[in-house]
A protein has these predicted regions:
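Conserved alpha/beta cores of soluble small-molecule-handling proteins
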Residues: 26, 30-232, 236-239, 265, ...
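Glycine- and Gly-Pro-enriched alpha-helical subdomains that act as flexible
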Residues: 239-260
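N-terminal amphipathic/basic-hydrophobic helices that include classical n-h-c signal peptides
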Residues: 1-35
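Secondary-structure junction motif
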Residues: 269-271
Length: 346
C-alpha cells in the first residue's frame, strides 16, 4: 500500500482478521496524511469535557479513610494499581445530594471485585458512608463527578503475584465539581474506527471496569492520530462494538441499535437507555451490525455516566444524518433519561 511516497506493510497474524479490521487499520494509518475536511478542523474533544471550575484545584480526596488536600493525596509506588493496573473503579454522579443509580454501580463494582478475588473490605453501606464524608468535606451536593477506585493494595515486593499484596485494599475517592460542557450537544463527537478491538472474555473481559485501560488508551491514541476525538472499536468478529470510553448506539429507520453487549463495558447508562426504549415503545435491538450500517445511520450517540448521551457527528469523516448525529429519537431518549435521573435523585 502506498500513500504520499510512503510504503506501509500490514501483516495480519490470522486469516480471521476481517475486512472491517483492515478498514480500521487503513483509517488509522492514512488519515493522518489525508486532507482534513473543513468540518473536522476543530479542536479535539472528549465525552468528558466539563466546564472549568476553579474549586477543583482545592478539593479534598479520600485515601484509605483519611480525607486530605489534593496535593497531599498519595498512594505507594508499591500499590497494585500503580504497578499492574490491578483494581476496579466506578464513575458516579451526585445530584441533589444523592448518587444517581447507586445500587446499579455497586452491583457492577462488587461483581467485578468478586470475579477477581479483590476484597473491598467494606460493604455498600460503608462505601456510601465514605462517599458522603468526602462530599461533605468538599461541600459538594450537585453536578459532582466521583471516581471511586479500589486496588488490591500495597505489595511487599514489586512483582505480579497477588499474594504479595498483603496490606488490604487501597481505596481512593476523587470528587470534582463537574458539569458537562454543553457545546458537545450541538457539535457532536468525531469518531474514527481503530485497529484496536475489545477482546474476547478469555483475555480480559470488557465488562470489568478495571484500572487496566491500556487497550482503550491505545484506541484513543489511534483515533486522535486519525484526526478524531474517540476511537470506534470493533469486536473480535469485525462488528461495531463500542468506543474507547463510552458505549455506542445508532438509529436507523426509527429503531435504536447497539452491540450485543458481549464485548463492551457493562455500562449502567447503556442499560438505562435500553430499558427506557423498551418502556416507551421505542424499538431497540442489541445485535451485530457493520460499519456499513453505522455509516448510514440517521442518528448516533454515545452513552456514559458523565456525558449521559453525546451525539456522534461523524464516523471516519462521514457525516451522520443531517444534523451532526442528532435527531428526534436521540432527543427523546435524552429527555427520558434526564427525567429518570431527576426521579432517582429526588
Amino acid at each position: 500500500l502506498e500513500a504520499n511516497n510512503e510504503v506501509a506493510i500490514l501483516v495480519f497474524p490470522s486469516k480471521r482478521f476481517k475486512l472491517a479490521h483492515l478498514i480500521a487499520a487503513l483509517n488509522a494509518r492514512f488519515n493522518m496524511n489525508a486532507k482534513v475536511p473543513d468540518h473536522m478542523t476543530v479542536p479535539s474533544h472528549s465525552t468528558h469535557d466539563a466546564l472549568e471550575d476553579e474549586r477543583n484545584q482545592h478539593i479534598k480526596i479520600y485515601v484509605n479513610g483519611d480525607i486530605v488536600p489534593r496535593d497531599q493525596a498519595k498512594v505507594s509506588v508499591y500499590d497494585s494499581g500503580f504497578m499492574l493496573g490491578d483494581g476496579m473503579w466506578e464513575g458516579m454522579r451526585l445530584y441533589n445530594g444523592k448518587w444517581a443509580f447507586f445500587d446499579e454501580h455497586m452491583d457492577r463494582l462488587f461483581n467485578s471485585c468478586k470475579a477477581v478475588s479483590l476484597d473491598i473490605g467494606m460493604d455498600r453501606a460503608g462505601i456510601l458512608t465514605a462517599l458522603s464524608a468526602t462530599a461533605a468535606a468538599n461541600d459538594m451536593s450537585h453536578d459532582v463527578h466521583c471516581r471511586l477506585m479500589i486496588t488490591r493494595g500495597t505489595k511487599v515486593k514489586p512483582f505480579q503475584h497477588p499474594v504479595l499484596s498483603q496490606s488490604g485494599p487501597t481505596i481512593v475517592i476523587i470528587m470534582e465539581h463537574s458539569k458537562p460542557a454543553t457545546s458537545l450537544q450541538a457539535s457532536g463527537i468525531r469518531l474514527a474506527t481503530v485497529p484496536q478491538v475489545r477482546g474476547l472474555p478469555m483475555s480480559q473481559d470488557a465488562k470489568f471496569n478495571s484500572h487496566s485501560k491500556l487497550n482503550c488508551v491505545i484506541a484513543c491514541l489511534q483515533a486522535e492520530q486519525a484526526g478524531a476525538d474517540e476511537g470506534l472499536m470493533l469486536d473480535p468478529h469485525g462488528f461495531v462494538n463500542t468506543t474507547n470510553a463510552c458505549n455506542f448506539f445508532i438509529v436507523r429507520n426509527g429503531e435504536v441499535w447497539t452491540s450485543t453487549g458481549d464485548y463492551c463495558m457493562n455500562g449502567v447508562t447503556r442499560q438505562k437507555v435500553i430499558d427506557l426504549c423498551r418502556a416507551n415503545d421505542i424499538p431497540v435491538h442489541e445485535k451485530n451490525y457493520s460499519l456499513y450500517e453505522a455509516y448510514g445511520a440517521e442518528e448516533a450517540f454515545l452513552t456514559g455516566t458523565f456525558g449521559a448521551q453525546t451525539p456522534v457527528a461523524t464516523i471516519d469523516g462521514k457525516r451522520i444524518g443531517d444534523h451532526d448525529g442528532l435527531g428526534p429519537v436521540s432527543r427523546r431518549i435524552r429527555q427520558l433519561y434526564a427525567d429518570l435521573v431527576a426521579e432517582n435523585t429526588a
